[in-house]
């Protein structure tokens, strides 16, 4: 066998090996029906907001959450009023949020506040009440399709 014929044979063999799996998968794909896709289950969200003296912006954020194009009964808004000296808690409650108040001058900061809030939610709501948590700053405003 000449060297060029040997090289041609090796190249043809390599291509045959590389593409031979298609001889199995193409006929199989003709007979297998695709799985029917289910409608996705809507998820329940808990929106967590840590706020400290945010009376001027907290209402606007809660209103933007309530204006979501996602089913309102699947969204619960929680606000932790952390060491506030203004009426942030009252404004948040008036806009429909569940409000917890925290007074701890020793452990100050968003991390402590969110930890406190998560402990309160775990105590007051059964496990599995929410599929996901969304953490927002009090000075945010979200678009109507943010959750979807």
PLM segments and residue spans:
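N-terminal membrane-anchoring/stem segments of glycan-assembly enzymes
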Residues: 1-41, 94
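Cell-envelope/extracellular polymer assembly enzymes that use nucleotide-activated donors
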Residues: 43-46, 76
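Conserved donor nucleotide-binding strand/loop of the catalytic core
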Residues: 74-75, 89-125, 132
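Active-site beta-to-alpha loop of glycosyltransferases that engages the nucleotide-sugar donor
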Residues: 49-63, 83
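Short, acidic, metal-binding catalytic loop of nucleotide-sugar glycosyltransferases
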Residues: 63-74
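Acidic helix N-cap motif at the loop->helix transition within catalytic regions
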Residues: 59, 86-93, 145
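Short beta-strand-to-loop acidic/aromatic patch adjacent to the donor-nucleotide binding site
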Residues: 125-141
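A conserved acidic beta->alpha catalytic loop
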Residues: 81-89, 104-106, 141
């Amino acid at each position: 066998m000449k060297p060029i014929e040997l090289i041609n044979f090796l190249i043809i063999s390599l291509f045959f090996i590389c593409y031979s799996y298609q001889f199995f998968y193409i006929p199989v794909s003709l007979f297998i029906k695709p799985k029917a896709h289910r409608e996705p289950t809507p998820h329940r969200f808990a929106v967590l907001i840590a706020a400290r003296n945010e009376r001027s912006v907290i209402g606007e954020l809660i209103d933007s959450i309530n204006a979501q194009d996602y089913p309102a009964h699947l969204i619960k808004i929680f606000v932790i009023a952390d060491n506030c000296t203004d009426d942030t808690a009252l404004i948040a409650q008036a806009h429909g949020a569940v409000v917890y108040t925290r007074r701890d001058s020793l452990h100050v900061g968003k991390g402590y506040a969110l930890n406190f809030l998560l402990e309160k939610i775990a105590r007051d709501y059964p496990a599995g009440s929410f599929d996901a948590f969304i953490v927002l700053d009090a000075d945010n405003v979200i678009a109507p399709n943010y959750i979807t």
